[in-house]
Structure formats: C-alpha cells, structure tokens
Amino acid sequence: MKFLGIDYGQRRTGIAVTDAGGRMAFPRRTIAMTTRDAFFVELLGMVEVECPDAFVVGLPRLPGGEETLTTRQVRNFVERLKRRTTLPVYFMPEELSSFEAEDDLRDAGLRGRRLEAVVDQQAAVRILESFLAVPEERRSLA
C-alpha cells in the first residue's frame, strides 16, 4: 500500500509519501495555510498525483498522552479531510517529530528559509517511518 503522510500545522503542513509497497518514505512538499479551501485544493491535487491508498496523520500529544489544543486541531482537520475523500485515514501518535526533524536538518547544515522550507516535510517522513514500523493489526484508523 502507498501512504501519504501529513504533519498538519496551522501555518504549514508537511507532506511525505511512501513507495508503492509502503516500505520507504520520501518528503514531497510543504503546503502553506492561506485559506482552508486553498489548502484542501492543493492537498487533494497531491492525492490525484500521488495516488495513495490511505493517509497517515501525525497526532501530537504530550509525553504523558494528554491531548492538547493542537491535538484537537488535528482531529478537526481529519474530520474535514474525511468529508472530502473516501480514502482511509490513520492516526500515528507523534511527539516532537518537528523538533527532531529540525535538529537533524540543522545537523545537516540547513538554516533559515532553507530549513523552514523542508522541516515539515521531514516531520511527515518521520511520521510515516514510525507508522510503517507498527504491525498492521496495531494501526489505528481515525
């Protein structure tokens, strides 16, 4: 199966995809949040190009598992996404994926705008890699 990973954010959303066999994840793009409609037009356009079988959306929580405002925003986004597509949506618990991705990219020498342009994509890659490591029977549909 091919998955499209999403690191949803209020300002920017990182997108990554797996290969057709669902074994490796690759960064694709960052979608800037201008308006909700424009955002979904761009996201669904990527779905037409990439042809994924399902979405994997990072679900941020505090280290103790408590939900936050950001968690609720992601859940609301997923509900809007499910109204626009018939593809299944999986949640992948994530803690600090964006911070870890930023650290890795800084270590690789990226700074400023170059870093900002790809950090959300790299966070989406991390979300997909974590998801792919989970046995299928333990994956959680949204």
Swiss-Prot record:
GO terms for cellular component: cytosol. It is an enzyme of class 3 (hydrolase). The keyword Hydrolase applies. GO terms for biological process: rRNA 5'-end processing. Its EC number is 3.1.-.-. InterPro entries: RNaseH-like_sf, YqgF, YqgF/RNaseH-like_dom, YqgF/RNaseH-like_dom_sf. It is found in: Cytoplasm. Keywords: Cytoplasm, Hydrolase, Nuclease, Ribosome biogenesis. Could be a nuclease involved in processing of the 5'-end of pre-16S rRNA. PANTHER family: POLYNUCLEOTIDYL TRANSFERASE, RIBONUCLEASE H-LIKE SUPERFAMILY PROTEIN. Belongs to the YqgF nuclease family. This is Putative pre-16S rRNA nuclease.
